[in-house]
């Protein structure tokens, strides 16, 4: 009987310990495990959300990059058009200036030619008068007249 009473008390202590563990020890442990499980689940969800946010950010970056490339391309084309326009305008202005300078030079040359002709005419008239004067002062002689004409030619 002594053995039976020991087993009985051991069983009673075991059941009390089991009840005590189930009532007071086990709930905080399960609560701590559930909280830890929830933290892990929240962490995984946050990681998935972070991945999704990263994918969205990368998509936005690629859109912004494409937009910037197209905008830069448009700006480059516009700058090239503007440069071509400026070059063409400068070419037209230079051509107009060249035409004006050529016209002015032609006009100056024509005036100079006219002055030279007028001066030559005056010189020829003066020489003709001088020659006629010398011819009239001398007697009529073909050799003398030829000599005077040669002198006039030399003066021209």
From Swiss-Prot:
- Range of residues in the leader sequence: none
Where in or outside the cell is it found? Cell inner membrane
Keywords for this protein? ATP synthesis, Cell inner membrane, Cell membrane, CF(0), Hydrogen ion transport, Ion transport, Membrane, Transmembrane, Transmembrane helix, Transport
Predominant place of localization: membrane
Molecular-function annotations in GO: proton-transporting ATP synthase activity, rotational mechanism; proton-transporting ATPase activity, rotational mechanism
In the bilayer, the protein is annotated as:
Single-pass membrane protein
Q: Which InterPro entries match?
A: ATP_synth_B-like_membr_sf, ATP_synth_b/b'su_bac/chlpt, ATP_synth_F0_bsu_bac, ATP_synthase_B_chain
Q: List residues traversing the bilayer.
A: 7-27
Q: Provide the function of this protein.
A: F(1)F(0) ATP synthase produces ATP from ADP in the presence of a proton or sodium gradient. F-type ATPases consist of two structural domains, F(1) containing the extramembraneous catalytic core and F(0) containing the membrane proton channel, linked together by a central stalk and a peripheral stalk. During catalysis, ATP synthesis in the catalytic domain of F(1) is coupled via a rotary mechanism of the central stalk subunits to proton translocation. Component of the F(0) channel, it forms part of the peripheral stalk, linking F(1) to F(0).
Q: Which family does it belong to?
A: Belongs to the ATPase B chain family.
Q: Which NCBIfam families match?
A: ATP_synt_b, PRK05759.1-2
What subunit structure does UniProt give?
F-type ATPases have 2 components, F(1) - the catalytic core - and F(0) - the membrane proton channel. F(1) has five subunits: alpha(3), beta(3), gamma(1), delta(1), epsilon(1). F(0) has three main subunits: a(1), b(2) and c(10-14). The alpha and beta chains form an alternating ring which encloses part of the gamma chain. F(1) is attached to F(0) by a central stalk formed by the gamma and epsilon chains, while a peripheral stalk is formed by the delta and b chains.
Stated name of the protein: ATP synthase subunit b
Question: Per the UniProt entry, what species is this protein from, by scientific name?
Answer: Bordetella petrii (strain ATCC BAA-461 / DSM 12804 / CCUG 43448)
